[in-house]
């Protein structure tokens, strides 16, 4: 489109300018550009006149293809906005085309075009004919004027129908245009176009059924759509009948029946009557009198059933037509000789079945059936009297001599009714033929021969030639046994005695059989006569003998019938089995082949899909990149154009082209803009300064001149206001005086009624006083009764409330006393336990000192012996001292930097037994517990001295960790002990929950499991003496951590570990009290918080942490859980038991002022068995922070702890029975259990969860426990816990640095590989002892925390009310951890 036609209004104006000068083609081009433009795809009001003008030009120029394009574009524009505009435009277009065609028709004398097909106007024959015959002026005028316009109008109809098809919004317009097209075909007798139009409509209907999922699709189940389609098809049927296109009419009938079948509801009776009427015409025109009569039967029954206002005349007319149509059905069967020879029975039957379907019949009708229906439904009684006897004469009575005379009277009456009954005239020829046939059938039964003249006299309504033809047809098709003798002019009947009639021969009135039929049935008659004679001839005893013989035969049959039957069944079963076997084999083979083919096809398909997917991804990626580049360039260009359009941009970039600007730096563009802006700003300020001086003088002068004028105007306005006020005041006074006079008049007039009013009021009060007093009395009585009832109800309620309050206070008092008593008992018990622990701790430390001294001396002696043995061995092997090696094996190991065993042989006193006794405990000699002091210098660097005792000579590959030389895990086939099992005879105190590392020097009083002189380094990862969490069939490879490179743990049903370890935890269990390993994954461990509901551990961060955070509720777990421990797991939403804590232990951050006694698994406490860790480290901070993530917890009553201890004692008894075989290990276990019982704190019951009833017992199981009270108490405890956690939670991670490492931490077993070499010298020093904690201070702090907890319990409701005013704030640190601040 040209640049100066950006708006549609301008285009329309330009087109009108072209039309004024007579240029239609340029005007059409202008409007065409507007309709094709993509910038005007939104409908506007101006579009409709543009489209009308565009179509007008298309009609004038006969540009049907341009009109089609324009209509399609306009449909896309206004379909979603204004569909009415599209209808108006289409109707206007067709109206203009019709007007042009009518004008051309008036100018032409040719009313009906001789051209057969408008799409192919000039055929070769027409060209040759015009060249030979010549063409006059009128013919040329008709060809040049009328023919193009008729073709244009036809194309317009066809284009509009294609445009509007399958669109529910313009469905009415579509059917209107279709009906107009039918009228066009009928008006101009366009048979070829009519056929094309019918095919197009049929194709559109099929498309509607296929594309029913579109948004604008037509729903054929809609009654309105069905009625419109049926209406159009009926118009099509009428037009086809009018144009005598019976093939198209029959197709229209099929289309109408198809629409009937689509409809769920039956069509209207009027529509069905019209349909039957049209179908009957089609059948009669096609020569099918049988279905024509059947259609009239259907129409007759429909009219009788549905029409309530059916008159007697209409009934007679319909019944007469039905009778004549039924009797007009040819008696001659439709099957001809050619059909019999070609065996076309199937085709005929199929054709009749289709025709019956169009009428809704189950089976094709027959002439006899229709006659019987006519008699059964009593149609004859409504027939006019003149025709009523025709049925009896033709079908019932046998009177050949008077038959034609009677029928002639009826036919003459029918011929006399052309005006009243025009449709009856068509039945006369068929009735004459049937009458002749009936006459011949009846005459053949009476006469053997008859003269032709005599027969002609019996049939007066036909001549001799027609009669002879009828006789010949009857002999050919109706099995009439007749011969014509032309010499004697006679007819002979039944002369051929060998003739046999066909089965489909017509049947009529019967008098006697023909001679040939009598001869053919002679044997049958003879048989019946002989049977009667035998009954007379044969006596009774012969019949009795026959009966006896019959019984004997029956008996013999019954005797052998079962056996014979079984034999037949067995043979049949054998045959069936063989068939089934062969079929199964064939099916199996075909199935295998099919599966093989499907597998190959699947592979090919997958490969092809993968290739296509990759190609699609690459193409999509390239397309996205190109689009991004184009969008980027377009955005930059538009931005630069916008900048240049502004005054500032035009000045700044007037000397620079847009192409150059695209390559410039954005900073340069911005600098240019800023520079130009500053420049204009300075110029503006200078202009404002110059104007300021001028404006000041001018304003001063104006105001001096205004002063006198303003004063004079003020005086004038004041005078006008005063006059106006005086005038309004006078009017107000006058009005008030008039109103007072009128009020006095009203008063005088109304005062005369005062006495009457008082009298009326007095009478009314006297009449209603008694009624008022009665109602007042009733009200007072009801009031007193209601007041008494309410007082009684209130008294009862107060009494009930006092009773409920008394029992509730009594119950609370009992509960409080019970809790106080339990608290006192717990304090006393804990105080006694602490005193006992202090005493045992002192004894333990003294014993440790002695053991350390013994171990040091023994280790020194062993070193001297080992040194001498090593030198002697070297001298014997080498024979000279030139091969100078390191002075001691310590140097070798230091240079190697690993714990692995070298290839040299071990000393005999160091070599363990050949069997794997070290797995069962026998391999640990008594002095291992005394070697710990000497082992310390070699802990990291020289581990090969204990290798023979640790593992046998097996073929396992070494571990891949930095210091773990154990072989990979093996299955149950090797002789190692399985990780899990009831027959595991390892020390039973190492259970699934115990993830502590091996005991070090200070706590090694456990017998032969870890002796003081055990020179093995600390076990890494999941070493051989861990608890039973590994099953016997587990064959996983080694761990992959810092010192343990085995794979992650495998969850599942066979993993019997305690529930504090989830299935996705890939770390090995902690190995004991002094486990000081760091996080599992090193410095980059950025995993989120643990998954336990009440996890109070810190995150797994930092390589210098004294131990990695625990997983779940295992930070204070019991130290000697066995594999068969039946306690419920303390992890997951179903776990109702919290960790073992005190009643007031809120499990927040473990700060330096924590007065609780050190627990097992807690590395933060000082002691000889724990590294000294600075309190308030990252674990305490993380525990305080993560405490806000889990649900609140309450302490567990002492009864729960006693229950758990009883279960533990039961497990101890089981373990003792298992360990009777190993008394050394039993002593070791008893010492360890004794120590752990001393230092283990009692666990608390989480108040927010409860365990199963069969495994938990507490004071709540009393008679007062019910669901509601328990829920209330649980909610109260949850609220108190939540308030306490939010109040005590302090995120002090930002204020504190990383945890300081003490001397005990420097030798922790989880140290990185690059730190071990530097720390080996430090590890050789003996461990330093740390004094026990101050127990008195612990007791004081414990009591303070309990008192504080009691205060918090009392004030939890006030805190809860204030809690709604607080807001939460989530803070995220640099490590990704989120802290909830309240």
From Swiss-Prot:
Subcellular location: Cytoplasm
PTM field: Phosphorylated. Phosphorylation is enhanced upon serum stimulation.
Region Interaction with EIF3B: start-end pairs: 664-835
Highest taxon listed in the record's lineage: Eukaryota
Positions of Sequence repeats: 925-934, 935-942, 943-952, 953-962, 963-972, 973-982, 983-992, 993-1002, 1003-1012, 1013-1022, 1023-1032, 1033-1042, 1043-1052, 1054-1063, 1064-1073, 1074-1083, 1084-1093, 1094-1103, 1104-1113, 1114-1123, 1124-1133, 1134-1143, 1144-1152, 1153-1162, 1163-1172
Gene Ontology BP annotations: formation of cytoplasmic translation initiation complex; IRES-dependent viral translational initiation; negative regulation of ERK1 and ERK2 cascade; translation reinitiation; translational initiation; viral translational termination-reinitiation
Composition-biased stretches (Basic and acidic residues): 866-1165, 1177-1328, 1336-1371
Disulfide partners: none
Modified residues (N6-acetyllysine): 68
Coiled-coil ranges (or none): 82-120
PCI domain sequence ranges: 315-498
TM stretches of this protein: none
Similarity comment text for this entry: Belongs to the eIF-3 subunit A family.
Task of the protein: RNA-binding component of the eukaryotic translation initiation factor 3 (eIF-3) complex, which is required for several steps in the initiation of protein synthesis. The eIF-3 complex associates with the 40S ribosome and facilitates the recruitment of eIF-1, eIF-1A, eIF-2:GTP:methionyl-tRNAi and eIF-5 to form the 43S pre-initiation complex (43S PIC). The eIF-3 complex stimulates mRNA recruitment to the 43S PIC and scanning of the mRNA for AUG recognition. (Microbial infection) Essential for the initiation of translation on type-1 viral ribosomal entry sites (IRESs), like for HCV, PV, EV71 or BEV translation.
Subunit structure: Interacts with EIF4G1. Component of the eukaryotic translation initiation factor 3 (eIF-3) complex, which is composed of 13 subunits: EIF3A, EIF3B, EIF3C, EIF3D, EIF3E, EIF3F, EIF3G, EIF3H, EIF3I, EIF3J, EIF3K, EIF3L and EIF3M. The eIF-3 complex appears to include 3 stable modules: module A is composed of EIF3A, EIF3B, EIF3G and EIF3I; module B is composed of EIF3F, EIF3H, and EIF3M; and module C is composed of EIF3C, EIF3D, EIF3E, EIF3L and EIF3K. EIF3C of module C binds EIF3B of module A and EIF3H of module B, thereby linking the three modules.
The name this protein goes by in its record: Eukaryotic translation initiation factor 3 subunit A
Organism: Homo sapiens (Human)
